[in-house]
């Protein structure tokens, strides 16, 4: 029973399923915030990945934590264009010149590829944080030397706590991250096509 929540007033039952990825994103942002030596609002932030978790991390960072210096990267132009409709950030391809070595205070890796991890450790500033959320690849090379010598904090995050989920329901019901009009509804018979597009 402790994991069953009533949908609050202000949150449409069609929007309620977004609570799960929002709670994952909130949990990651809160853990990232705890790891920093300055407020999130003062950080230059990279969000790797423009899927649901990446977009939601960006919305929480921007609309709740006051972070106005966000770069979101994704190789899929359709995702970038969609995210740009709802999030105030700079949107780039992962290979863009905007993503330079030692230039971000905190990175949220919502992808979890070897390539995204390598980029994260390259672009994080000394003393910065990498919050690893994505689970695409289990292993691969990583610059532990930079992590050690430059005192970079690397934290893995998984799911959320009950407190995170309760807070998420309030955030969604109060529209604290904006309207959820970015949610798309498709017939189940078109599910395969939807996955191909992402």
Residue ranges and their predicted role:
Residues 11-94:
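Mid-domain Rossmann-like dinucleotide-binding core that forms the NAD(H)/NADP(H) cofactor-binding site
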Residues 115-174:
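Glycine-rich phosphate-binding loop and adjacent beta-alpha segment
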Residues 47, 109, 132:
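Redox-cofactor binding/interface segments in oxidoreductases and associated redox assembly factors
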Residues 98-107:
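A short acidic, Gly/Pro-enriched loop at the edge of an enzyme's catalytic core
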Residues 89-96, 185-190:
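Short acidic-hydrophobic, aromatic-tinged amphipathic segments that line or gate anion-handling sites
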Residues 1-5:
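Glycine-rich phosphate/adenylate-binding loop and adjacent beta-alpha elements
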Residues 118, 162, 166-198:
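C-terminal hydrophobic helical "lid"/dimerization subdomain
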Residues 41-44, 104, 127:
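Phosphate-coordination loops involved in phosphoryl transfer and adenosine-cofactor binding
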């Amino acid at each position: 029973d402790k994991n069953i929540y009533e949908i609050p007033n202000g949150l449409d039952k069609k929007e309620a399923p977004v609570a799960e990825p929002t709670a994952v994103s909130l949990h990651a942002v809160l853990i990232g915030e705890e790891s920093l030596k300055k407020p999130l609002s003062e950080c230059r932030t990279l969000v790797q990945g423009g899927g649901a978790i990446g977009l939601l991390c960006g919305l929480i960072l921007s609309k709740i934590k006051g972070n106005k210096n966000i770069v979101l990267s994704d190789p899929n132009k359709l995702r970038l264009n969609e995210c740009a409709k709802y999030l105030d950030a700079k949107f780039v391809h992962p290979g863009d010149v905007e993503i330079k070595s030692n230039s971000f205070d905190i990175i949220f890796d919502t992808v979890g590829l070897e390539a995204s991890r390598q980029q994260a450790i390259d672009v994080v500033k000394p003393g910065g944080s990498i919050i690893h959320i994505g689970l695409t690849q289990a292993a691969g090379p990583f610059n532990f030397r930079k992590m050690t010598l430059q005192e970079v904090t690397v934290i893995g995050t998984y799911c959320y706590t009950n407190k995170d989920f309760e807070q998420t329901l309030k955030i969604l019901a109060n529209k604290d991250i904006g309207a959820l009009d970015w949610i798309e509804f498709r017939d189940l018979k078109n599910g395969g096509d939807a996955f191909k597009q992402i």
